[in-house]
Amino acid sequence: MRYLTAGESHGPRLTAIIEGIPAGLPLTAEDINGDLKRRQGGYGRGGRMKIESDQVVFTSGVRHGKTTGAPITMDVVNKDHQKWLDIMSAEDIEDRLKSKRKITHPRPGHADLVGGIKYRFDDLRNSLERSSARETTMRVAVGAVAKRLLAELDMEIANHVVVFGGKEIDVPENLTVAEIKQRAAQSEVSIVNQEREQEIKDYIDQIKRDGDTIGGVVETVVGGVPVGLGSYVQWDRKLDARLAQAVVSINAFKGVEFGLGFEAGYRKGSQVMDEILWSKEDGYTRRTNNLGGFEGGMTNGQPIVVRGVMKPIPTLYKPLMSVDIETHEPYKATVERSDPTALPAAGMVMEAVVATVLAQEILEKFSSDNLEELKEAVAKYRDYTKNY
């Protein structure tokens, strides 16, 4: 399974093409649109989300509510494009129109300046448009397809925010994936401890009044994962490594950890390793899950627990200093629409990319042309691992 995304933030539409989804997977636009709506939601989102109401359109690969095995093409229209027809025109236009909304003051922390240098742009809008987090719309759409596949294989996935700008959220112990999903969905800030809800919302309001932004940490948890996905035989086949790459590819994500993560560096080995248990009913399990579901780059049957750290959104309403690329004079950075935080939305994107990598790994291990073949292969493998 592989995919590509295309489109600009203020272009006419966003597109994704997925190849390798087996035939026969039940799939409708509603399966995608629910996740797209959650990506646009969350406390603290800005004006762009009031303009767009993302709805996916299938243009290939799905017929009568099921995948056909052909490449799946999905489009999402950018409604805001109508205000940018000249600025984002694919055809050459008059110079006086080209100068409208031209960007020569790069924003610190964005791709603006480095993209301009790399691709030799005199208008940094070209960097801004493609590097925008608007692209994650299609990664969420791709992830929704992947999640539909994982659900057919009895795997479930959820995300929630565990740190808001330095404020850690206490997470009740032993929550199931379903409970995490339910609690986070009921929270405007995607947390599972509702006693902290108003405190976090008040904090976001204060950050907005200050013209500033905050980052944080989001966690994705996956249950029902088969043992042995990934491999130790080559560095690039380790599944936790593939997941780490996918997570830090998300806009503004700067770090990733599994299970205890960096805390493991402060503990003794006896306080980190997960003791192995066996029972006739469950087969092999672990007493704890400090390693986040991975040993040797492979899934060990425990829930996958992965966290990603998101830096504060770099577009500030009180902009930092920058330099004009035409005059080299100091200027305040360009201000585009921004949010005080996008952590709840980022959690949806992280959930999507994790689901996508897991679907890719499943289809690599259990190559199948149609869904029934895949389900039979996975069920047979689960029986084998349980009775090993």
UniProtKB/Swiss-Prot annotation:
Annotated residues for binding of FMN: R130, S131, S132, N251, A252, G296, K311, P312, I313, P314, T315, R337
Cofactor binding, per record: Reduced FMN (FMNH(2)).
Any one GO molecular function term: FMN binding
Function of the molecule: This reaction introduces a second double bond into the aromatic ring system.
Binding site for NADP(+): R39, R45
Entry-linked PROSITE patterns: CHORISMATE_SYNTHASE_1 (PS00787), CHORISMATE_SYNTHASE_2 (PS00788), CHORISMATE_SYNTHASE_3 (PS00789)
Subunit structure as annotated in this protein's UniProt entry: Homotetramer.
EC number: 4.2.3.5
GO BP of this protein: amino acid biosynthetic process; aromatic amino acid family biosynthetic process; chorismate biosynthetic process
Cofactor(s) required, per the database record: FMNH2
UniProt keyword terms in alphabetical order: Amino-acid biosynthesis, Aromatic amino acid biosynthesis, FAD, Flavoprotein, FMN, Lyase, NADP
Transmembrane segments: none
Gene: aroC
PANTHER family noted in UniProt: CHORISMATE SYNTHASE
Protein's name in the database: Chorismate synthase
Family: Belongs to the chorismate synthase family.
Organism superkingdom: Bacteria
Pathway terms, separated by semicolons: Metabolic intermediate biosynthesis; chorismate biosynthesis; chorismate from D-erythrose 4-phosphate and phosphoenolpyruvate: step 7/7
Catalytic reaction equation(s): 5-O-(1-carboxyvinyl)-3-phosphoshikimate = chorismate + phosphate
Cellular compartments per GO CC: cytosol
